[in-house]
A protein has these predicted regions:
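Loop/turn elements at helix/coil->beta-strand transitions in domains of secreted/extracellular proteins
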Residues: 2-5, 41-44, 75-79, 139-141, ...
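Active-site catalytic loop in hydrolytic enzyme cores
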Residues: 89-161, 170, 176, 184, ...
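CN hydrolase (nitrilase-like) catalytic-core segments centered on the catalytic cysteine
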Residues: 63-81, 149-253
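A short C-terminal boundary segment appended to hydrolase-like catalytic domains
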Residues: 226-300
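Ligand-binding pocket scaffold of soluble enzyme catalytic domains
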Residues: 4-11, 22, 37-39, 45, ...
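Active-site-proximal beta-strand/loop segments in catalytic clefts of secreted hydrolases
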Residues: 10-12, 48-51, 83-86, 113-114, ...
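Cys-nucleophile CN-hydrolase/nitrilase-fold catalytic domain and related Cys-dependent amidase chemistry
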Residues: 19-104, 172-173, 180, 184-185
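Active-site-proximal beta-strand elements of phosphoester/diester hydrolases
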Residues: 4-19, 23, 112, 140-148, ...
């Protein structure tokens, strides 16, 4: 069944100064920026860039930045990421994290940066365990933080977990690697980065749907998380039958050059998986697995 949500990724340029000055200015900026983005786009989810409050290590959920964003999540009734340095109360360990607050301002879950960049280790930041999913009302989501984007093993972990949505919180952009993550994991990718490069929203075929720009500090898109990814081979000949039977209730998006399609359910009566099963479509991973098997059979 269709699962539409509005997602917004917001850019920000962290400030400098004493720890107290940084916190006060950052909190003031966040109230303004999140408020403007939320009023303009009415999002279900807002993604913010990495370690948004510099030198503001805090416990979660009681830390000041977490509490500020929790109040904004409640005010605007949306999920909001919390990109901070989390300090554990018992051990004193520090992690670079992407927390996720729900519409009530409650902490839904935390993703810890898999591989911090080397200066972070010098400052005591510890690595996270790897891919993990945070449960939300619109399905499980995965987190990725900055330098993590470079490591294929983390992407492979997410590929096995099969989230429909990846949240990327970062200092740097990553360029086409963002699009490859979306394509390879077959997930929507919402990237929030520091000002100077665009925030992005990318679909499961690696197509960029929306970007921020020099005039607007956020990117916004309405996306449908009820989808299945298939290859054109063995499937394309059936598309006309699907359209004939279901019309606008099923949307098929085919990206040029890549050789894939995304099947979206646009109705409450059936899921995209139901459509795939009814018309015996072959999912992308199944097609690749079958192709590998076929190769093995023809080696001898």
């Amino acid at each position: 069944m269709s699962n539409h949500i509005v997602v917004s990724s917001v850019s920000y340029a962290p400030v400098s100064g004493t720890d107290q000055e940084v916190m006060e200015q950052t909190h003031k900026d966040l109230k303004d920026l999140v408020g403007r983005a939320a009023r303009a786009t009415r999002p279900d989810l807002i993604v913010l860039p990495e370690t948004i409050c510099r030198n503001c290590d805090e416990e979660m959920p009681e830390g000041p930045t977490t509490q500020l964003l929790a109040s904004l999540a409640r005010e605007y009734s949306c999920y909001i990421t919390v990109p901070v340095h989390q300090k554990e109360r018992k051990s004193g360990a520090v992690f670079n994290v992407l927390g996720l607050l729900d519409r009530q301002g409650e902490l839904a879950g935390i993703y810890r940066k898999y591989i911090p960049v080397y200066p972070e280790f010098d400052h005591g930041t510890r690595p996270g365990p790897g891919a993990s999913l945070i449960q939300t009302e619109f399905g499980p989501v995965g987190g990725v933080i900055c330098f993590d984007l470079n490591f294929g093993e983390l992407r492979a972990q997410y590929k096995k977990l099969k989230p429909k949505l990846l949240l990327f919180s970062s200092m740097y952009h990553g360029g086409l690697v963002q699009n490859f993550w979306a394509l390879d994991v077959q997930a929507f990718f919402v990237g929030s980065v520091y000002k100077g490069t665009p925030c992005t929203i990318i679909d499961p075929q690696g197509t960029t749907l929306a970007q921020s720009n020099n005039y607007q500090s956020w990117a916004t898109a309405r996306i449908n998380l009820d989808y299945e990814v298939v290859h054109l081979d063995k499937n394309q000949a059936k598309y006309d039958d699907i359209h004939r039977q279901y019309g606008e209730a099923v949307r098929i998006v085919t990206t040029g050059e890549v050789g894939t399609s995304v099947i979206y359910s646009e109705t409450e009566e059936r899921t995209a998986a139901d459509i795939v099963d009814e018309f015996e479509l072959v999912r992308l991973d199944e097609y690749f697995d079958w192709s590998r098997q076929l190769r093995t059979e023809h080696l001898t």
